[in-house]
Amino acid sequence: MKEIQLKGGDVHGIVNVVGSTIARKCGQGVYIHSGPEQAVASTKAFTNMVASLLLFAIRIGRTRNFSREKGQSIIKDFERVPELIENYLANPGPIDEAVELVKDAKSVLFLGRGLSAPVASEGALKL
């Protein structure tokens, strides 16, 4: 962040806590208002940051060649996330099998590339 600012770049923060160090140092950005964090690895803050980045990406895309319809389609799909999570929790399926495989493991390697890389990092942090 410092390096970008030293070179004249703008830094925008996506933060949960008003007045946090990142919020103060950036001076501009978005507050996601996820509520108090119970742990450093806060799932709700991570999820809300991903949602904010999705909206930000759509907004940037609209300034280029991203159609309004495509943006609306992505938002419509994203609005289904709570329903999809509820469906999963009601019937976890093959994830239960994966849990059985790793529940007694001494170590687990999380892999992800592209858009899945931060999710893999978050999973590793939480396990």
Predicted regions, residues:
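Secondary-structure transition/capping motifs at alpha-helix termini
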Residues: 1-12, 21-25, 32, 63
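H-loop (His-switch) motif in ABC-type P-loop NTPases
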Residues: 15
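Active-site phosphate/pyrophosphate-binding segments
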Residues: 18, 28-126
